[in-house]
């Protein structure tokens, strides 16, 4: 199985990106709490959670009858897309530094 | 396109490395960090205080597109012109803790220069949180764009 391609397929879907975004700001959430944030039917959200878990982007923890989900930061960091926005932010900032200083030099 | 800026963040470590080669002589690169007016221009921030010496400190205030004000501050521990800055850095009111930053500046043969930043966080979780922020922000931007597209006109 080509896991890498699967990961990109997983984050290509807007609902799944929204789930990841939701979980990026909290330690963990139950399937019910996640579903409550969306208009989609609960089984649809469950399917998305299954895919994200299968791609190792989410970790699952069962306590009693509730399943808790959390972002698998370890795996997410391996996805270039995860660290890329952080890198792009610095690239942008440093490009600006370069252009500001080139103007400064020619003054 | 070649990636000029590199970020290294190994799993389970509480620091990250940012490195970049600049098409600028070393003196100009360092000046970009030393002069408040220049820092303000490239960082897009208001420099409220910048006292570049050992025991000195800095204070930045940035306003985001929504008008929210964000404060950043820190204390300078080492200040060696054209070589090294060691300072603390804190994003006030955010859960990233205080970072210890070491900035190493060096000259490269062909009139270029390089900067290497090591940022040490107080925990692995705080480093990961910081790394996640632009990712989460990017996701929400994508989400907002999608909402705009789907919005009935």
Model regions and ranges:
Chain B
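Hydrophobic ligand-binding cavity/cleft-lining segments
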Residues: 1-46
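Short, highly charged C-terminal tails/helix-capping segments
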Residues: 151-153
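A short, structured loop/turn motif at beta-sheet edges
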Residues: 26, 77-83, 104-114
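Intrinsic-disorder/low-complexity, polar/charged segments enriched in Ser/Thr/Lys/Arg/Asp/Glu/Gln
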Residues: 13-19, 57, 71, 84, ...
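Beta-strand/loop substructures that line and gate deep hydrophobic ligand-binding cavities in soluble
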Residues: 93-137
């Amino acid at each position: 199985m080509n896991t890498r391609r699967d990961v990109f397929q997983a984050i290509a879907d807007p609902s799944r990106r929204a789930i990841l975004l939701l979980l990026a700001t909290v330690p963990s959430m139950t399937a019910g709490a996640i579903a409550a944030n969306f208009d989609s039917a609960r089984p649809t959200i469950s399917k998305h959670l299954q895919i994200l878990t299968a791609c190792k982007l989410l970790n699952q923890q069962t306590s009693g009858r509730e399943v808790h989900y959390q972002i698998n930061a370890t795996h997410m960091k391996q996805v270039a897309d995860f660290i890329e926005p952080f890198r792009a932010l610095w690239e942008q900032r440093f490009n600006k530094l370069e252009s500001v200083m080139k103007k400064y030099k020619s003054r | 396109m070649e990636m000029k800026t590199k970020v290294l963040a190994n799993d389970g470590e509480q620091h990250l490395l940012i490195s970049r080669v600049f098409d600028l002589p070393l003196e100009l690169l360092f000046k970009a960090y030393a002069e408040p007016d220049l820092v303000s221009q490239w960082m897009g921030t208001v420099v409220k205080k910048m006292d570049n010496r050992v025991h000195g400190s800095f204070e930045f205030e940035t306003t985001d597109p929504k008008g929210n004000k964000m404060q950043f501050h820190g204390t300078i521990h080492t200040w060696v012109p054209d070589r090294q800055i060691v300072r603390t850095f804190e994003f006030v009111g955010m859960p990233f803790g205080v970072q210890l930053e070491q900035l190493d500046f060096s000259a490269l043969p062909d009139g270029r220069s390089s900067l290497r930043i090591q940022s040490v966080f107080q925990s692995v979780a705080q480093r990961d949180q910081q790394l996640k922020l632009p990712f989460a922000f990017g996701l929400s931007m994508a989400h907002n764009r999608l909402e705009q597209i789907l919005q009935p006109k």
